[in-house]
Amino acid sequence: MHAAPCGAPGPRPRFELADVAHLCGDELVRAGRLTAEQRKVLRAISRCRTAELGGHLDVCEDCGYERPAYNSCRDRHCPKCQALAQHRWLQRRRERILPVHHFHVVFTLPAELRPLVKANSERLYALLFATGPASLLELAADPARLGGEIGVTAVLHTWRRDLGFHPHLHCVVTGGGLDGRGQWHATRPRFLFPVRVLGKLFRGKLLDALRRLYARGKLVLPGSLGDADAFDELLDRLYHKSWLVYCKPPFGGADAVYAYLGRYTHRIGISNSRLLDVSKRAVVFRTRSPRTATLPPRVFLARFVDHVLPPRFVRIRHYGLLASGNVNGRLAQARRALGPSRVAEPAPAPEAGHDDARDQPDHLRLYRELTGIDLRLCPRCHARAMSPRPLPRAKQPRAPP
């Protein structure tokens, strides 16, 4: 675990998701409606960067200034633990971004399917990944449209700004593809595929897959859907409904894609900075500026845990040219076909001073790159003399069975 300083410089949100978890997390657990993973996430968020997880004491060897630094929970649902993970992920991905324009495509599941998704989250999220990108790849392979293999990075989001349940898939799609002869075919500058055609293809693939899962007895059917006729009627209605697929105009080349991925890949349902007030009566949070929402704490927390992913579920996936099996083959071939180009460069790190920043431990170096703050500098005397000393982990009462 990495430790974050309690007194690190920089703005700190007045309220945190952990405050809501402390207020009513136990009450929600006692109600017995949480999965083991949801309970684990609430516990991690409640303990993140507290003495319960242990840590160390940064002590200035020159003036004696002390600053406790407690360990992070590193849970992917924790709003305090995403920045370093996101930065590391982007550094690994940046060299794979092709120097072409890209499109942003969003596949959204109809509201009628949300109860079924909640009851079968792992299967249905996987189905969304299996059908959305496959629809893009199929249209791209059609010689009448593009006649090549595109690259797709897909990211699962499950929320609206008010924390309502709204599963959808964000896809970053290359504005062109590689054909079987190694030639690159670019799309038109502001047009990928007809969204109505894409929506129909996505709808057909997903509903056909749902029928197959149902026939094999692989679905948990909530409420009235347990009746075979009700399930068939639902799918029939959805076959005759237009499905929402959104395709945004393209953003620029590699630099723009790099910046965009930085905003979307490790986003969670809500950030601490959006919390405006937390009390026993209500949680007030920002939705879309200047709009806000107000919910009872228990309702707010219940909405948040709806977005806890199944254990080990991969929420960022790559397809086509960007699939892991194509990195050294088709992707490299596409790069050669496109010719020499500049790959997106990360923002330069702050000057390292007398000691090279590369000599710092990884988390200290990344923290410095992201914030410009050197945690080895003493806030009081400004000597580069902060050194860590162990802190004991706080004792906890034994949890109930």
Residue ranges and their predicted role:
Residues M1-P401:
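Beta->alpha loop/short-helix hinge microenvironment recognizer with preference
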